[in-house]
Amino acid sequence: MLKRLLKRPSLNLLAWLLLAAFYISICLNIAFFKQVLQALPLDSLHNVLVFLSMPVVAFSVINIVLTLSSFLWLNRPLACLFILVGAAAQYFIMTYGIVIDRSMIANIIDTTPAESYALMTPQMLLTLGFSGVLAALIACWIKIKPATSRLRSVLFRGANILVSVLLILLVAALFYKDYASLFRNNKELVKSLSPSNSIVASWSWYSHQRLANLPLVRIGEDAHRNPLMQNEKRKNLTILIVGETSRAENFSLNGYPRETNPRLAKDNVVYFPNTASCGTATAVSVPCMFSDMPREHYKEELAQHQEGVLDIIQRAGINVLWNDNDGGCKGACDRVPHQNVTALNLPDQCINGECYDEVLFHGLEEYINNLQGDGVIVLHTIGSHGPTYYNRYPPQFRKFTPTCDTNEIQTCTKEQLVNTYDNTLVYVDYIVDKAINLLKEHQDKFTTSLVYLSDHGESLGENGIYLHGLPYAIAPDSQKQVPMLLWLSEDYQKRYQVDQNCLQKQAQTQHYSQDNLFSTLLGLTGVETKYYQAADDILQTCRRVSE
C-alpha cells in the first residue's frame, strides 16, 4: 500500500505542460484577477466575456513559454522558478497590497536579515510552503513519460503552441480595445500579473544597477565656505536626522489629536506641515533627497554614481559623520565617514539584529568633544519601520494600548495597529528631542542647528494597503506626506540673522518637499557653490540683511 502511494505519478509531456501552465497562470494570479474585478465591473455580458478571456490569455502565454522551453529540456526548472516567484509575489500582493516593480525589487535586495526575519509569519511560511515549495516539488516529482515518437512529440508541442497563439489572436481581435482601455487607465494592474511582474521588475533593477559602475560624476567642485560662517572661535554643528516610515498625519505637531510629539512641542521647533517625499521607499527617497535633482527630474541611475550634498559639504572643509541604524545609506554616505551602529549589537539596545534608535548616540558625545572644526552629523534612524512596529520602541514608550505585538499586522484591529505605530512616533519624538538636548549641551563650543526629515510615509491598512513602496503616481498621501522640522539655537538665529517668526509663518503657508534639503543644508552650513539654489533654501527668505 505504502509502495503504491509513494509511486511517482506519470504524465505525458503535453499533459504536464498544460497542468503546469494552468497552475502558474490561474492559481498564482488570483491577486491579479481580484484587482481586475475592481477595475472592470461585471455589469454586462461583454465585460464578463472580457474578464473570462484574461485567464485564457495568461494560460496561453505561459503555455507557449513552457512548451518552447521543453525543446531545450528546461521546462521543469523554468516551471519551478515561475511557481516559486509567483507564489511569493501573490502572497505579498494579497497580504500587504504592494506592487511588484523596480523599487520593490530594490527594497528586497536592500532588506537586512533582521527585516526579512520580521516579515516571516506562520501564515507566510504555510502559504509559500504549500503554494510555492510543495507545488514546485510536485512539478519535479511527477514523472514525464518518454515520447513513443520524437517526431510526434514535436508535432504535438508545435500544435500546442499554435493553438495558444490562435487563442491570443482571437482574444485580441475581439477585445483589443477593452484591454487597451483597461490597462491604459489602470497602469499598475500589469504589475500584479505573475510571473511577468517579477521578471520585468528584476530586469529593470538589473539594468539600473549596471550603471552603478560608471565613473563618479563630481559636482560642487567650486564649494567654499561663506566668510560669515568661517574663522570664528565658535564653530558650527548641525545634526540631520533622517526618519524612516514616519507619516505626517500622525504627528501631533501636524495637528494629529493624539500627543505623539510631547517633547518636541516644548522645543521651539519650526514644523513644516506640507512636505512631500521624493519616493515611497528608502531606496528611492534617501539618494534623491541628498542629490541635486528635484523629484520630477530625478534619475536613479545617475544618482548611483554622482556626488551629493554631503560630498559638497565635506569638500568645503566641514567634518561629516553618518551614523546608520537602518540598513545602509543607499549611496548617500559612500564617500564620507560613516559607521553602522546596528552592528555594535549593544546590550539592552538591540533585538534580533535590530536596534532601538538610541544606539545612534553611542560614542557621539566623545566625537563632538574631539571635533575641532565645523561638523555635520547625520543620524539615519530605523524610526517606524514595519511590520514589526512593536520592536521599534522600548517598553516604557508603550503609551497607547492595546498594541499589535506581531508581524502579522493584517490580523490586528485598526486600533491596535494605529496604537503601535503611534508609539513608534512617541519614541521618534524622544530621539529628536535627545539630539536637540545634545546640541544644547555643546553650545559653549558650537553654534547649533538640527533638521529632521522622514524618508517616506506608511499605509496602515487604509483601503487594504499596508507598509509602503507603491508607485508614486498611485500611492496614497499617507506614503508621500512626511514630517519635516527645523530647530535653530538662539545663538544660530542671532549670529546668522535668521528670523524664526518668519520661518513659523512661512512653514504654515508654503509647500515643501525633499527637494528643499539639498540647498537648505548648504545654506544652513554656509557652503557656497553654483549648485546652491536660493529658492529651495527654506531659510533664505527669513534671513535678515545686516545693515
From Swiss-Prot:
Family indicated by similarity: Belongs to the phosphoethanolamine transferase family. EptA subfamily.
Compartment(s) where it occurs, according to its Swiss-Prot or TrEMBL record: Cell inner membrane
Cytoplasmic membrane side: 1-9, 69-79, 145-154
InterPro entries membership: Alkaline_phosphatase_core_sf, EptA-like_N, PEA_transferase, Sulfatase_N
Chief localization: membrane
Induction remark: The eptA-basRS operon is positively autoregulated by BasR under high iron or aluminum concentration conditions.
Domain of life: Bacteria
Mode of membrane association: Multi-pass membrane protein
UniProt GO MF annotations: phosphotransferase activity, phosphate group as acceptor
Assembly notes: Has been isolated as a 91 kDa complex containing ZipA-EptA and an unidentified 24 kDa protein.
Pfam family, one: Sulfatase
Annotated protein name in UniProt: Phosphoethanolamine transferase EptA
TM regions (residue ranges): 10-30, 48-68, 80-100, 124-144, 155-175
Periplasmic side: 31-47, 101-123, 176-547
Enzyme Commission code(s) on record: 2.7.-.-
One record GO biological process: lipid A biosynthetic process
